[in-house]
Regions:
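Structural microenvironment flanking redox-active thiols in thiol-disulfide oxidoreductases
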Residues: 69-112, 123-129
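Bacterial N-terminal signal peptides that target proteins for export
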Residues: 1-3
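Short, internal strand/loop/helix patches
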Residues: 106-140, 144-146, 155
């Protein structure tokens, strides 16, 4: 009887964990609203999330070698995901600090063949002060649904190496596998 009770409790505990984990993935933590310019100087805002089933938002900076190294892989993912109505946006966290930083970011993106939007956040703006400034490890990536909610925790490190995690979250949002 003790063995049976232990088995039942263990099953309940495991079920509770997986259920809680799934709840965390579909929680409604809003991605902060923003209205910024991209690296090309065009306006972009958080309204863009509504145009796609999901959006991958990748934070990087000019001094991050691993961020720059993954850009061709992100471009490849962007091209593949476009067909599934999934967008990818980069955020060059230091590109808004000076004209020199912006020019460096533009050079990097051109050299790496990046065609997806890249935001150049204003370091004096709320988006930067309330969210971007708190990111301490690069690259850091978020998955955002069409309502502007973050799905799951941040993904730190190379996105392609964590593609299973990305695909799981995208499947929760889109129902696609």
């Amino acid at each position: 009887d003790l063995l049976l009770l232990s088995a039942v409790l263990m099953t309940a505990a495991l079920t509770g964990c997986s259920s809680g984990e799934e709840d965390a993935l579909v929680s409604k933590t809003p991605f902060p609203e923003f209205s910024e310019v991209d690296i090309a100087g065009d306006e972009i805002s958080s309204d863009i999330f509504a145009d796609y089933d999901a959006t991958i938002v990748n934070f990087w900076n000019n001094g991050c070698g691993s961020c720059i190294a993954e850009m061709p892989e992100l471009e490849e993912l962007y091209q593949d995901f476009k067909e599934r109505n999934i967008n990818l946006i980069g955020v060059g966290t230091d590109s808004g600090e000076s004209r020199e930083q912006l020019d460096t970011a533009r050079e990097i993106l051109k050299e790496k063949g990046v065609t997806y939007h890249n935001i150049s956040p204003d370091p004096e703006g709320d988006f930067y002060k309330d969210f971007v400034a708190d990111i301490s490890t690069y690259p850091t990536t978020y998955i955002v649904d069409s309502e502007g909610n973050i799905v799951g925790a941040d993904i730190v490190g190379n996105v392609k190496k964590q593609l299973d995690t990305v695909e799981t979250r995208l499947a929760l949002i889109t129902g696609q596998k």
